[in-house]
């Protein structure tokens, strides 16, 4: 079976073609970084308009890359949520229209399920059950995964997501959009322990996260110190260390509570080198294993949507024409396969 995947939940237009026997046949991605750079963040209306311009040309490019056409497809998968409602509507409208015109099923995919399953695109894939840390600009959550669609949310952010805190703190440091990766790069030049920020909610039981207070602490420190480059780097280092320590502590707690020794990290922040190193050390100490997608599949992409859509397609879980986009969509409400 072969499926087209469409991702348009935020500021990346991702298109992919996936074959359940041959694997990923095509992957096309357009980032809107230049569109939003002058505004310091994503402008929803501009994001939607750019998806309108880019989606169909990228689909044509994917067909050319894969050496196939619509007649070779068995379904079309699209991101139905969560995300920016206007951006979601673009991908949903195009995906459902193409599926209807080509007389093949449409499959509505949960964006975070796409991230959660992204490591399945690699050679070394995790077996069920595993613990998943989903950490991105819009979400931070810990999920126990017993199988596809069998998700138990163990904890999630009660305010800002980790990626959002990265981006907002980067903006306070005067870094250009997208700030998260730039803050991580700046942190490499920072001096350890010059500044020390709190590790939010680690002194309380449970697996929920909170990063707004950490962002506030960074804001106060920035305001009260000189704005020379070394000071900025030291603050970036302290901030990143605090976020990573918090995530690692929560992962260790989740693994200990469940007795599971397989950990998946996915989402944009999972590309952070220091986070990967820390979690690899943790899993080595626990005689377990950590899994994550290649860097290009950490951020939003069509490949993860195509893969997740294929699993739903094979299970006969299709989207009806009245299927709505869901800007808010709990991952633990999904149907099990």
UniProtKB/Swiss-Prot annotation:
<dbReference type="GO" id="GO:0061711">
    <property type="term" value="F:N(6)-L-threonylcarbamoyladenine synthase activity"/>
</dbReference>
<feature type="binding site">
    <location>
        <position position="272"/>
    </location>
    <ligand>
        <name>substrate</name>
    </ligand>
</feature>
<dbReference type="InterPro" id="IPR017860">
    <property type="entry name" value="Peptidase_M22_CS"/>
</dbReference>
<comment type="similarity">
    <text>Belongs to the KAE1 / TsaD family.</text>
</comment>
<comment type="function">
    <text>Required for the formation of a threonylcarbamoyl group on adenosine at position 37 (t(6)A37) in tRNAs that read codons beginning with adenine. Is involved in the transfer of the threonylcarbamoyl moiety of threonylcarbamoyl-AMP (TC-AMP) to the N6 group of A37, together with TsaE and TsaB. TsaD likely plays a direct catalytic role in this reaction.</text>
</comment>
<keyword id="KW-0012">Acyltransferase</keyword>
<dbReference type="GO" id="GO:0005737">
    <property type="term" value="C:cytoplasm"/>
</dbReference>
<feature type="binding site">
    <location>
        <position position="300"/>
    </location>
    <ligand>
        <name>Fe cation</name>
    </ligand>
</feature>
<dbReference type="GO" id="GO:0005506">
    <property type="term" value="F:iron ion binding"/>
</dbReference>
<feature type="binding site">
    <location>
        <position position="180"/>
    </location>
    <ligand>
        <name>substrate</name>
    </ligand>
</feature>
<feature type="binding site">
    <location>
        <position position="167"/>
    </location>
    <ligand>
        <name>substrate</name>
    </ligand>
</feature>
<dbReference type="InterPro" id="IPR022450">
    <property type="entry name" value="TsaD"/>
</dbReference>
<keyword id="KW-0963">Cytoplasm</keyword>
<dbReference type="InterPro" id="IPR017861">
    <property type="entry name" value="KAE1/TsaD"/>
</dbReference>
<feature type="binding site">
    <location>
        <begin position="134"/>
        <end position="138"/>
    </location>
    <ligand>
        <name>substrate</name>
    </ligand>
</feature>
<feature type="binding site">
    <location>
        <position position="115"/>
    </location>
    <ligand>
        <name>Fe cation</name>
    </ligand>
</feature>
<dbReference type="GO" id="GO:0002949">
    <property type="term" value="P:tRNA threonylcarbamoyladenosine modification"/>
</dbReference>
<feature type="binding site">
    <location>
        <position position="111"/>
    </location>
    <ligand>
        <name>Fe cation</name>
    </ligand>
</feature>
<protein>
    <recommendedName>
        <fullName>tRNA N6-adenosine threonylcarbamoyltransferase</fullName>
        <ecNumber>2.3.1.234</ecNumber>
    </recommendedName>
</protein>
<keyword id="KW-0479">Metal-binding</keyword>
<dbReference type="Pfam" id="PF00814">
    <property type="entry name" value="TsaD"/>
</dbReference>
<keyword id="KW-0819">tRNA processing</keyword>
<keyword id="KW-0808">Transferase</keyword>
<dbReference type="InterPro" id="IPR000905">
    <property type="entry name" value="Gcp-like_dom"/>
</dbReference>
<dbReference type="InterPro" id="IPR043129">
    <property type="entry name" value="ATPase_NBD"/>
</dbReference>
<keyword id="KW-0408">Iron</keyword>
